[in-house]
Amino acid sequence: VMQYPEYQLFDETVRADIAYGPRNMGLGAAEIDARVAEAASFAGLDASLLDKSPFELSGGQKRRAAIAGVMAMRPEILVLDEPAAGLDPRGREDIFKGLARYRAESGATVIVVSHSMEDMARYCDYLAVMNDGEIFLRGTQREVFGKSDALQSIGLDVPDVTRLCALLREGGMPLPDDIYTVEAATAAILPLLGGDADA
């Protein structure tokens, strides 16, 4: 899925666009229809949009249509370039949770290209940081985000919550140094303040 979905959409209707891949895979009409419905639902596309021209859609809807077109083929390897760019926070979360679910259910490899360290911290278990066309860092979240100086040297940073927790540690709060998500920070901080992290 490309960063600019308008370069990926081309057919007369959103439905035809999503069906393009499965049709070229030689699938039957019933299977194509089922995959179109499934992929549209996965991407959060309302069924009322399926018979519209993809060029009438908003930017976020185009992104969802482009993702649906790829998902309809049920790929074993899925490469997405900034899949949540232009989506509101709920849309971002829906797309990334859907990708995580797809990966878990299908066993597919999902590769996401993104500048959002927050998204990468929440949804990726292995990271490769590119700089000038080469791999600059790679490893687990701990291995990559533990090198904040190296990340900053190329214009990236650790997630905001990681920086916040580092400041809290400097102030004396006994927090682990591997907090990369708001959820992990909440779970670590609330008990220290007498709250219940599970509430």
Report the location of each language-model feature.
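Conserved ABC ATPase "signature" region
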Residues: 30-48
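Conserved ABC ATPase signature
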Residues: 53-57, 61
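Hydrophobic anchor residue at the start of the ABC signature
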Residues: 67
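Conserved catalytic motifs of ABC-family nucleotide-binding domains
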Residues: 74
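Catalytic Walker B motif of ABC-type/P-loop ATPase nucleotide-binding domains
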Residues: 78-81
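H-loop/switch region of ABC-family ATPase nucleotide-binding domains
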Residues: 114-115
